[in-house]
């Protein structure tokens, strides 16, 4: 049986990696070995940062809610505790949006939380 070289498979694999490395600076976008290393690292970063994005957005929402609460004379933890006691089930994303865009409705929620604490 004749020896089979990995011609077409290798070319296909190299093209796939170089396509993923498109736009990288210098040899990281041109040479297969270096591009392959960079693509592997980039995919690792992408996986990690998809998890981190969720944490960062939650932190941002909490910061916005806290700032709006303090303008209305209540701390964040008392506000959240008051909402839970009042039976209000609005997630932090919606609360942050209300705090930025609909201050009147947010103020009503703050009053409700103050009464139930």
From Swiss-Prot:
GO molecular function, one term: structural constituent of ribosome
Primary role: Binds directly to 23S ribosomal RNA and is necessary for the in vitro assembly process of the 50S ribosomal subunit. It is not involved in the protein synthesizing functions of that subunit.
GO biological process, one term: ribosomal large subunit assembly
Keyword rRNA-binding recorded: yes
Name the record gives this protein: Large ribosomal subunit protein bL20
CDD domains attached to this UniProt entry: Ribosomal_L20
Assigned keywords, A-Z: Ribonucleoprotein, Ribosomal protein, RNA-binding, rRNA-binding
Transmembrane segments: none
One Gene Ontology CC term in the entry: ribosome
InterPro entries linked to this entry: Ribosomal_bL20 (IPR005813), RIBOSOMAL_L20_CS (IPR049946), Ribosomal_protein_bL20_C (IPR035566)
PANTHER family in the cross-refs: 39S RIBOSOMAL PROTEIN L20 (PTHR10986)
HAMAP family linked to this entry: Ribosomal_bL20
Family: Belongs to the bacterial ribosomal protein bL20 family.
One Pfam entry name: Ribosomal_L20
């Amino acid at each position: 049986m004749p020896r089979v070289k990995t011609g077409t498979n290798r070319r296909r694999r190299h093209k796939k990696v170089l396509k993923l490395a498109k736009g990288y600076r210098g040899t990281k976008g041109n040479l297969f070995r270096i591009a392959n290393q960079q693509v592997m690292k980039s995919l690792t970063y992408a996986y990690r940062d998809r998890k981190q994005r969720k944490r960062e957005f939650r932190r941002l929402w909490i910061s916005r809610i806290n700032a709006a609460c303090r303008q209305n004379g209540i701390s964040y933890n008392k506000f959240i505790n008051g909402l839970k006691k009042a039976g209000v089930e609005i997630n932090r994303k919606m609360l942050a949006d209300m705090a930025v865009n609909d201050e009147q409705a947010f103020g009503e929620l703050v009053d409700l939380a103050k009464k139930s604490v």
